[in-house]
Amino acid sequence: MTVTDTLVENSRRYEEGFDKGDLPLPPGKKIAILACMDARLNPYGLLGLEEGDAHVIRNAGGVVDDDAIRSLSISQNLLGTEEIVLVHHTDCGMLTFTDEEFAGKLEAEAGERPSWSAHAFTSPEDDVRSGIEKIRSSPFIPHTTTCGASSMTCMRGS
């Protein structure tokens, strides 16, 4: 049995016991979280959230790119969120390469460069500041939106 097979089976069991179907579509706390996709990071646990509380949007690095703005815009303009929190962390994989290195690797393996940027960064703090500025300057995010940031320290085991 593959990991995917196991996950599909887990999904079936979860659906059978799912009891949150009556939760409203808009998140109860009217907040959207943009977080890194790092498997060690649990935004719900980190921020004390439960299902139905928030929209949790994840990507590599938790960067504010066009797709993040798209999701945040839908969350804000159609589903009533009023606050956005960016979650970055130490020991992030996005700190381990440059955009040029990654594009070169993909070109070597796939025969062409991607049309998009990986948005690697050298400082989580600077990327959070940049992300907040991108959100605040976007015409697609209401200017009444409150932005904040959270960070988590990841410690590697010895």
What function would you assign to each model-found segment?
Residues L78-H89:
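Ordered, amphipathic secondary-structure segments that act as subunit-interaction surfaces
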Residues L46, E50, N59, D91, ...:
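Short glycine/serine/threonine-biased micro-segments
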